[in-house]
Amino acid sequence: MPNTSKLTVLILAAGYGRRMGPFSRMVPKALVPYDNKPLISHIMEKFDPCTRFVIAVGHMGQYVKDYVSAVHQDKDIQFVDIENYAEGNTGPATTIQACEKYIRGGGFMWLACDTLFEFDYKDKLDHNWIGVHPVDSSVSQDYHWVERDGEKLIEVVDKKPSPHAVDAFVGLMYAKDDEYLNNLKERKAKQTPEGFEGLELKVHSIRKWQDFGTYEKWEELSSHLTDVSFPKPNELFYNDNNKIVKFWTETKHAELRVKRAECNPEAMPNNVEQAGNFLVHDFADGDIVYNRYTLPVFDKMLEWGEKELWKPAPTNITEQDKQKTCYKFYHDKTMERVEMIRTKYPNWSEPCVVNGQEVLSIDQYLDKIDWDWLCKETSWKFVHGDLHFDNTIYQYEHSTERPSNASIVNQTWWDEVAKKGKHHFTAIDWRTDFGGELYGDQYYDLAKMLGGLHQSYKDIKSELYSYKEKDDYATIECPSVQNVKEYELRLEKWVQANGLNWRKVKLLVPIIYLNMSPLHEAPFDKFLVALSQFHFAKVLDV
C-alpha cells in the first residue's frame, strides 16, 4: 500500500462563491456552515491527522486564514494567496498552478472547497484518478461530465446537456506525480480537465458526494438537519474541533466580547480569544440549562450568578453615569428598535387584542413607562447581557449512581441528590457591552431569566411557536418552562431577598421582547411585538 503518512491535499478556496445567497456577503464559500461546521472543516476531517494541507485563498481569504489557524492549530497547513482571483483570466487550473511550489515533487490530491465526499482513497495513491458521481440529465449542463469504459476515461464533456444521466466530475482528483502539473503549465490551462490530455488516468465512482455549489443546494442538503441555529443578520455560529466559534461581519463584536470576558474569566469558557472577525473559545462540557431543568438547578444557577457571575463593578462609576447608561440602553435603544419595526412594516398596526386580552399600542405603553424610575437605583455589576437558559452551560457531578428503577424514583429523592453534588455553570454567548460599558444593570440579566421562563427560547429555536393575526386580533403560542409559576416564585423571592425591585424586573421583560423583534424575520418579529404587548398589559394596565 502506498505511504499516506504525508499526503498533500490542496483545497481550492479562492473563488467568490457568488451563488451562495446571503452567505456571499458574509464569508467565502469555504466557511459556509453545514451542520455547525464550515465546509472546509468537513473536508479536512476526512483525512488523516498527519495530512499536509495547502489552502489556496483569495476572496475574503483572511477570514479563511483566521478561522483555520484558530481552530485547526494541530494540523500542518500552508496558505497560498491567489492574486487576480477576481479577473476573468483565472480559473481552478490557474489556482493549482499558483500553488506549484507547495505541491510539486510528489503526489497530491486537490478538491474544490464546496465538495464533500465519502470515498476510500488510501489504496488508490499509486495512479492518477478523478472522482465522478452520477447526476440526472436535467442538471448535466451544470457539470463537466465524463464518458468512460469502466475505469478508463474516454472523454471529458464541458458542461453540455445530455439526454441521459451522466457521471459528473465532482472536482476531486489525485495526481501521483508532476505530470498533471506539467500539462496544466504547458497548456496555460484555466480549467482543470485541460490537464487530463495525455495523462494515464482512471475514473473512480464516489460513493457519496454532496455539492454545495449554490445556496439552493445548501438549503436542500441542510433540510434534514435537526440542530437548528437561530441566526441573526451578519452573524454565524460554528461548533468545530472542540471549539465554539462565532463570526460577525464587524470585528468589534469579537473584540468587545474578549474584553468583557477578561473582566470575569471565572464565569466564562476557557481560552476566550479573538481571531479577526471570529470569537473563539473552548467547548464547555455539559448541557444548556433548558435541558437540565429542575428547581434545585434553578436555585444553584442563582447561587452561581450571585457568587461568580454578578461580580461588583468598579467603584469609580458615578450614579449619574449609571443612570445615563441605563437610559441610553433601555429608552434610546428601545425607541430605535421601534423605529426599525415601523420602517420594516410601514402599514402595519399592532393588534388590539392578544390571546383574548385587550392591549394598548406599543406607543401608548412606552408613554406609560416612567423611564427615570426605571433607570434609577440600578444594581451595577458584571452582567451576562443575554442570560437566558440557552446561553448557560450546566454540568453536574455526583457520586450517586442512577438506580435501575429510576423512572419510578420519587422526584424529591433526585432533588436531594442534586443538592449534594457539584454544580458547574459556564456563561456563553454574552453581550458585547451594556450601553457601551463593560459593566451593567443586574436587573437586565434577571429580566432575561424571567423572559426565558415565560417563553422557552429553546422551543422557539425549534420553531415550536405560532403567530396568527386577523384584523386587530392576534393569537400567539409558545411553550413556557414546565411549572413556570414555581420558578417565577423562586426568582421573585430571590430578587426581594437581595433588596431588588420585582416590578422593575417584570417591566423589563416586555421591553426586551420588543427590542428583539426587528432583529428577526417574520413571523417571529410580529410574534415578539404581540408578546411584548401582552406582558406590558400585565405590568402597566393595573
PLM regions with names:
Residues 2-64:
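N-terminal glycine-rich phosphate-binding loop and ensuing alpha1 helix
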Residues 69-148:
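Conserved beta-loop-beta/alpha segment of the NTase-like Rossmann-fold superfamily
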Residues 116-191:
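Conserved core of the sugar-phosphate nucleotidyltransferase
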Residues 230-259, 277, 282-283, 288-293:
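ATP-binding glycine-rich loop module of kinase domains
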Residues 263-268, 289-385, 497:
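Conserved kinase catalytic-core helix
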Residues 366-440:
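Active-site acidic catalytic loop and adjacent metal/ATP-binding pocket
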Residues 420-425, 431-493, 510-524:
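Active-site activation/catalytic loop segments of kinase-like enzymes and analogous catalytic loops
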